[in-house]
Design a protein with these regions (language model features):
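Canonical positions in the second alpha-helix
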Residues: 56, 89-90, 123-124, 157-158, ...
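Canonical tetratricopeptide repeat
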Residues: 69, 103, 137, 171, ...
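TPR/TPR-like (Sel1-like) alpha-helical repeat modules
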Residues: 364, 412-439, 462-465
Length: 467
């Protein structure tokens, strides 16, 4: 039987959990059940939320709010048809309850019908006295629809309602960034900081906008203010370090990265950036020390392995570079950047068969960058496969139809094959695309640049371009 409880009314969760451990049944107000259920839902304890809903409806079978929480759980668990049937019944009981429209919107959102979800949320707005949560949901629906302008406006309303709603603040800035309106973001954040001068989150975001615009002194000031507002804000120290790197102040950058390590468990990203700073300072042993720590901390961080490989590659220690890129490939053989670097190293070692294989792997895994096509063609040429080199360049041309580099290189290889007709077409196309890059052709194919055949083509195209 239900018992009265001497528990304080502000302790319904403790009281409920105590009840679950015994055979007693305590009575709760419907509002208490709502608080208990919200607590469990917010903490991801769905099973306990469902228990609270079941007991709550046994004690308050007419409570629309408890039934709506049951619908919320059904939607979360993707029992959408059952949830819709419940909502149909509830709407006959209370047709002006905005939560009914919100849950219907959630169902449509789950079905990827975001336009219908928006329409229902706008209906809920007309019924609600407190529209804060609805604007947040609208913002998310607009994000799903890639309508970043309307999403930004919705999240701005949330921030205007509660300036401590940092989740919405982040979303506002995300929308500005996606719209590439960095000036708009800077203006918005400065306006926000006029009202909240000690908000470390806003200072941090402002610094990132300045960094994007390469306004490094302003970015540095913003991150300093973020640290003044919260001297344990790790993100501000890390971003400040990146700014100091850009300004060439590598020792100061190291101090900021080390601060993040001292405040929290070390991260591979911090080790990596410290290593790069030491390399810039020509502290080679320290650079290696931190690069090795980077891959020890996170063996799957591709930037770490590439940093060690590049370290040796820049010093022309190609065998060591090859050793480390092969270790990286053993960890992640599906990484196109690893294969591209492997190709560069094998080319430097004049192992052109291996380089050809590595370039092919990189392309097959989705690396379609222009230098990859050009490098692969050069390797094919070194392997005496001129026809293969031309074929590679024609593939690359599909991705870069306006690339003069591809055209000049194609013309040179076609001349090597004595394919004069296609060589003429390729060279004319290259000159029309970028006459100024004729030097690329001259440097790679000096044996042809001074021939009458090439001079005549160059002269004719030059005259046509002047007209």
């Amino acid at each position: 039987m239900a018992q009265a409880s001497n528990e304080k009314p502000n302790q319904p969760i403790d009281k409920f959990e105590s009840m679950l451990k015994t055979d007693d049944v305590y009575f709760f107000d419907a509002e208490d059940f709502e608080d208990i259920i919200h607590h469990y839902l917010n903490n991801g304890k769905i099973a306990l939320a469902k228990k609270a809903i079941k007991i709550g409806l046994q004690q308050h079978p007419a409570s629309v709010e408890l039934k709506l929480l049951e619908v919320e759980v059904l939607v979360f668990e993707n029992h959408l048809d059952i949830a819709e049937n419940y909502l149909d019944v509830l709407q006959t009981l209370d047709s002006t309850n905005e939560e009914i429209f919100i849950q219907r919107a959630n169902i449509f959102s789950k079905k990827d019908n975001h336009e219908a979800a928006v329409a229902l949320l706008n209906e809920a707005l007309g019924l609600s006295e407190n529209s804060f949560d609805i604007h947040s949901l609208l913002g998310m629906e607009y994000l799903f629809m890639d309508d970043f302008k309307l999403a930004k406006e919705s999240f701005m309303r949330c921030v205007a309602f509660d300036e401590q709603d940092y989740s919405s603040l982040y979303n506002v800035i995300y929308c500005f960034e996606f719209l590439e309106d960095f000036d708009g973001a800077i203006h918005y954040l400065n306006d926000y900081l006029e009202r909240n001068p000690y908000c470390e989150v806003a200072w941090h975001q402002l610094g990132k906008q300045y960094f994007t615009k390469k306004m490094y002194p302003e970015a540095l000031t913003a991150f300093d203010f973020a640290i003044i507002s919260d001297d344990t804000f790790i993100g501000a120290y890390f971003e400040k370090g990146k700014v100091l790197e850009k300004l060439g102040k590598y020792n100061e950058a190291i101090e900021n990265y080390e601060a993040t390590i001292q405040m929290e468990d070390p991260t591979s990203h911090a080790y990596l950036r410290i290593g790069r700073c030491h390399e810039q300072l020509e502290n080679d042993e320290m650079a290696k020390y931190y690069y090795y720590h980077t891959v020890h901390e996170d063996p799957l961080l591709d930037k770490g392995w590439l940093a060690i490989t590049d370290f040796y590659f820049r010093r022309k220690e190609y065998e060591k570079a090859l050793y480390y890129i092969n270790k990286a490939l053993n960890i992640d053989g599906e990484n196109p950047q690893y294969w591209k670097k492997c190709a560069h190293i094998n080319s430097a070692l004049e192992k052109f068969d291996q380089a050809d294989f590595a370039y092919k792997q990189s392309i097959d895994l989705g690396n379609y960058e222009l230098p990859t096509w050009l490098g692969w063609a050069d390797v094919a040429c070194q392997n005496q496969d001129i026809a293969g080199a031309v074929h590679i360049l024609l593939q690359g041309q599909e991705f870069y139809p306006e690339s003069a580099e591809i055209k000049y290189k194609t013309a040179g290889f076609q001349l090597e094959m004595n394919d004069m007709i296609n060589a003429r077409i390729s060279l004319i196309d290259a000159l029309k695309l970028d006459f100024g890059k004729l030097e690329l052709f001259s440097s790679q194919f000096p044996q042809y640049i001074d021939t009458d055949w090439v001079r005549n083509i160059v002269s004719k195209v030059e005259r046509s371009l002047r007209q």
